[in-house]
Amino acid sequence: MPVDLGQALGPLPFLAKAEDATFSASDATQQRELANPETARQLFRQFRYQVLSGPQETLRQLRKLCFQWLRPEVHTKEQILELLMLEQFLTILPGEIQMWVRKQCPGSGQEAVTLVESLKGEPQKLWHWISTQVLGQEIPFEKENLTHCPGDKLEPALEVEPSLEVAPQDLPLQNSSSATGELLSHGVKEESDMEPELALAASQLPARPEERPVRDQELGTAVLPPLQEEQWRHLDSTQKEQYWDLMLETYGKMVSGVAGISNSKPDLTNLAEYGEELVGLHLHGAEKMARLPCKEDRQENDKENLNLENHRDQGCLDVFCQASGEAPPQTALSDFFGESEPHRFGGDSVPEALENHQGEGTGAHLFPYERGSGKQPGQHIQSSSLGELTALWLEEKREASQKGQARSPMAQKLPTCRECGKTFYRNSQLVFHQRTHTGETYFHCHICKKAFLRSSDFVKHQRTHTGEKPCKCDYCGKGFSDFSGLRHHEKIHTGEKPYKCPLCEKSFIQRSNFNRHQRVHTGEKPYKCTHCGKQFSWSSSLDKHQRSHLGKMPCP
């Protein structure tokens, strides 16, 4: 079954109508569009949850779109499985290869694998297709010496499926001077404060000079607009690298726009109107990355959802995919925090930094170092997932505490004892702890006049006077005044000895007996006579010794 450019290349312009479509039989035009499995697939993959519609209606529409795409009444289970596997395989391909393979319309996963493997022996085929099919540049076939696949076409115009007619107010973007330019940029906000070396004119379109000699020598002149070779020679290597990445991103934007908008191809010989919008976008193979803007005028319901399709071309997809549980669609986007341009990680928490990036729309770095983190601009932290970012954040906080820095604001607000500095989660815990310093007691026994801090201790003490033993052993029926005593007794019946000495492997039922046994190996003598200073390992030995000073019993 034919597969189009797919979800990784941006949302469809008629997506705004997809959620409210009723698919009535009276709308013949819309029925014809939805009869196309590829159109139904795009609608299914890019469908968004609407709070006003409710979960039941949303599930109904989603089920209908899924049936229109997979067509279970026509396809077998094996064919449906093959469609799903093909979709996932194409989704995880690098951006440039994915564009080319999708254009060949593979019918199965094996056909897609064959197309990808064909590029290994003939890498020029990909760049020839980009120049001829996407840019419309005329490159002599003999010069490229290519062997094309049966599905490889060399016509300068792309053949596209007919799309739904969308009114201007239904377009996903507003406030645009050029509707086509806005659709190509897929919601990328113009940046007025971009760095000078990144704000290059479209006429300075470079090819990579060192790493791709074949591509530069054979396609460098053809890719550049006319009469711009002189400007190209004056660019340094960094500018050429940056603009080559921008050019590849432009290809993806244009192919995505053509696949879902119309069959007209915009003239890219003058990219000045798209230059600022496309600066900062990242594609597979890019080693330099500028700022990653987010859409400023996003609808309110998009803030409640993680709309992956609107962020797919902005490099921040890995972070959102981690939150939503969906796998990153492209290998290129998984390198968002790559080695070539590691992003700065500031003092904000991960949720705060993510919220700032999603809501501000200022084009700032995802984790800017300027936000009170104390890090210098040159200090970078590399990461590839949200979990690694969290680990790095915790490591930063741990290092800060080791250096003697002040506690976090949250720790400063917790109840703290002024006497010993202990911190508690509740004020009630602090109040109870302070009684240990003041000696204040609330529970007094009227029989022996003993006082207790805890009510539980007071209740246990009263049972010594009343003889109450509410805790009964299930094995022998013996009663105990508290549950802890019952637990120790039950271990006699079960033979459980959880405390084992690592030196002599002797086991004990109670922790207290285990602690006393360890003194045999360590030689510890915690009990000291106040008269002569002699020390003992056991309290019973100290009692016998003290009697010798009182004259009751000679010292053993």
From Swiss-Prot:
Residues 41-123 form the SCAN box domain. Residues 169-195 are annotated as: Disordered. It holds the Pfam family SCAN. Keywords: DNA-binding, Metal-binding, Nucleus, Repeat, Transcription, Transcription regulation, Zinc, Zinc-finger. One of its GO terms (biological process) is regulation of DNA-templated transcription. InterPro entries: KRAB, KRAB_dom_sf, SCAN_dom, SCAN_sf, Znf_C2H2_sf, Znf_C2H2_type. GO terms for molecular function: DNA binding; zinc ion binding. It comes from the Eukaryota. One of its GO terms (cellular component) is nucleus. May be involved in transcriptional regulation. Belongs to the krueppel C2H2-type zinc-finger protein family. This is Zinc finger protein 18. It comes from Mus musculus. The lineage of its organism: Eukaryota, Metazoa, Chordata, Craniata, Vertebrata.
